[in-house]
Amino acid sequence: MRKNIDISRLRGKLREQESMSRHTSWKTGGAADYFYSPADIDDLSVFISAVPMEMPITWVGYGSNLLVRDGGISGVVISVLGVLDNLEIFNANEIAIGAGVPCVKAARFAAKYGLSGIEFLAGIPGSIGG
């Protein structure tokens, strides 16, 4: 894949054969063919546009309760941590929550604005996106 991607345009970190045990709460599992941690949303966009169409993409957040088989993950794994971490309130009663936001942070944000319905997230480890 590195041959097909202009890595000079990437600002994030692209790793080959990255052990998923470093990215899950279970601390087990084989390697991802490629693991990408984008620098920001623009960098993520550049990376995704460079990934070959036939290559599978797997998204991970904190990896809480994510069990990866010993054979690893084919294709590319993209971490949303630190990238898709937006929290916005609009129309006084709606929230936009990015996939990289910790569940407990989302629940607290809603409570701060007097919104209900996601209180259960306070007890769930990990991020909205996994």
Task: Label every PLM stretch briefly.
Residues 2-128:
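Anion-binding (especially nucleotide phosphate/pyrophosphate-binding) glycine-rich loop
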